[in-house]
Swiss-Prot record:
The protein's required cofactors: Ca(2+); heme c
Protein's name according to its UniProt entry: Cytochrome c-552
Entries under SUPFAM superfamilies matching the protein: Multiheme cytochromes
Lineage per the UniProt record: Bacteria, Pseudomonadati, Pseudomonadota, Gammaproteobacteria, Enterobacterales
Gene Ontology CC entries for this record: outer membrane-bounded periplasmic space
Principal subcellular localisation of the protein: periplasm
Residues that bind heme c 3: H94, C209, C212, H213
Residues involved in heme c 2 binding: C160, C163, H164, H301
Record's function text: Catalyzes the reduction of nitrite to ammonia, consuming six electrons in the process.
Functional pathway: Nitrogen metabolism; nitrate reduction (assimilation)
List of residues binding heme: C122, C125, K126
UniProt record, GO biological process: anaerobic electron transport chain; nitrate assimilation
Protein residues bound to Ca(2+): E215, Y216, K261, Q263
Length: 478
């Protein structure tokens, strides 16, 4: 009966001088190669959809920053040589999408549009301006160049046109008009047999979220976004795909392992869990129907924890009370956390032991099978923990992946012990003090004082120029 109620409710749902920096970014002008129908300014739709807009704005209340590296300094070692070792915060409200990608140390401190460590693709899940630029420039045009090139263009936070065809008649009539605004996401869904236009309403609801809440990588010279789903969506399928094309995100600076970095694979892990298998969608749990002051139902766009709207989410299907369900979820979360830490401890040792083997004169041939085990172990660990809600979405799959990661890490360490013995090293390889984020970063040679100073200079000088240029071009409200 509760399931019928849910379906009925679904039916109604939806450090150069300042003047130099100024001149560099002032030279950028909008391209008008194609007719653009994507309106990226979210406030444009406030009069037509006031309840949805105000609830979307309320994601700004989810403002707390949680430093994942400070909470777990092991991560610094696992990501040694990669920007995530500098800075990794847990996710917060959608209203901070653009702010957070500007402020993270991972994007560096570029001085010009052609400067910096990361490609344009790093904007891809942050703003409806991405959909506008893809429509305007084409995918090749959008992906071309460095991340800093998009600074004056990608300025509106993740919002309406990311998920809705706001230029359609259906949207004008108050219908949801869901859309995949990223062509690469549409191709990925087709690769797993889910063409968006042929999908049902419930499938489309989750597919829209799956444009961003997925694993992806940067493909080819242009660093275009691609989902590694050609062989399937399970961790082993994606691992097989990456291995076949000899892809790596970076090389760990300690062990010299060609590594894979998982992003935020909620769509994949949700699909593997009981909710996904029963088509209980992202919307059902994170964007329920609620009533406004006049008693009218609307979709709550303050995307958040389902327990915050228990009566409108979990209680539609579950007969247990809130406290009982919270206890179950907490137990699952703790089980995954405990195994996660055990795997990390093994991987930390493996990276330092591999470094010791290289230092002792190990050859590429001797190290290859060991590095392969480290790569596969950390990939499986990462895909499990990068999906922050896996304890709810697919706890069994999370534990399975972590168990497999533990086995692979143990294999690597066994092989390392044997190899080190042939080099005359039979003692335990000592670890440096990595008890805090700062100590771990020092252990891998990061100059965090310099990195932070460069970032602050970028935020004080470059970002204001981006915003001024965006206002001049009509991309931001005054």
């Amino acid at each position: 009966m509760a399931r019928k109620t849910l379906r009925a409710r679904r039916f109604f749902s939806l450090i150069f001088p300042f003047f130099f920096i100024t001149s560099v970014y002032a030279e950028q002008t909008p391209v008008s190669a194609k007719t653009v129908t994507v309106e990226a300014k979210n406030e444009t739709f406030a009069p037509q959809h006031p309840d949805q807009y105000q609830s979307w704005k309320a994601t700004s209340e989810q403002s707390a920053r949680e430093d994942a590296l400070a909470e777990d300094p092991r991560l610094v070692i696992l990501w040694a040589g990669y920007p995530f070792s500098r800075d990794y915060n847990k996710p917060r409200g959608h209203a901070y999408a653009v702010t957070d990608v500007r402020e993270t140390l991972r994007t560096g401190a570029p001085k010009t549009a052609e400067d910096g460590p990361l490609p344009m693709a790093c904007w891809s899940c942050k703003s409806p301006d991405v959909a506008r630029l893809i429509q305007q420039e084409g995918e090749d045009g959008y992906f071309h160049g460095k991340w800093a090139r998009g600074g004056p263009e990608i300025v509106n936070d993740l919002g309406c046109a990311d998920c809705h065809n706001t230029a359609s008649d259906d949207f004008a009539q108050g219908k949801p008009a869901l859309t995949l605004s990223r062509p690469y996401a549409e191709r990925a869904m087709e690769a797993i047999g889910k063409p968006f236009e042929k999908a049902g309403r419930f499938d489309q609801q989750s597919m829209v979220c799956g444009q961003c809440h997925v694993e992806y990588y940067f493909d080819g010279k242009n660093k275009a976004v691609k989902f590694p789903w050609d062989e399937g969506m399970k961790v082993e399928n994606m691992e097989q795909y990456y291995d076949a094309i000899a892809f790596s995100d970076w090389t760990n600076s300690l062990s010299r392992t060609p590594m894979l970095k998982a992003q935020h694979p909620e769509y994949e892990t949700w699909s593997a869990g009981i909710h996904g298998k029963n088509n209980v969608t992202c919307i059902d749990c994170h964007m329920p129907k609620v009533q406004n002051a006049e008693g009218k139902l609307y979709t709550d766009h303050k995307i958040g924890n389902p327990f915050d709207n228990f009566a409108q989410t979990c209680a539609n299907c579950h007969t247990q009370d809130k406290a009982s369900l919270q206890k179950v979820v907490a137990e699952r979360k703790q089980a995954i956390h405990d195994l996660k830490i055990k795997v990390e401890d093994q991987l930390v040792h493996a990276h330092f032991e591999a470094k010791a083997a290289w230092d002792a004169g190990a050859t590429d041939a001797e190290m290859k099978p060991i590095l392969n085990d480290i790569r596969h172990a950390q990939w499986r660990w990462d895909l499990a923990i990068a999906s922050h809600g896996i304890h709810m979405h697919a706890p069994e799959e999370g534990l399975r992946m972590l168990g497999s990661a533990m086995d692979k890490a143990a294999d690597a360490r066994t092989k390392l012990a044997r190899l080190l013995a042939t080099k005359g090293i039979t003692h335990e390889i000592p670890l440096p003090d990595i008890s805090t984020k700062e100590k771990a970063q020092k252990a891998i040679g990061l100059n965090m004082q310099q990195i932070n100073a460069e970032k602050q200079d970028f935020l004080k000088t470059v970002v204001p120029q981006w915003e001024d240029q965006a206002r001049k071009n009509g991309l931001l409200s005054q």
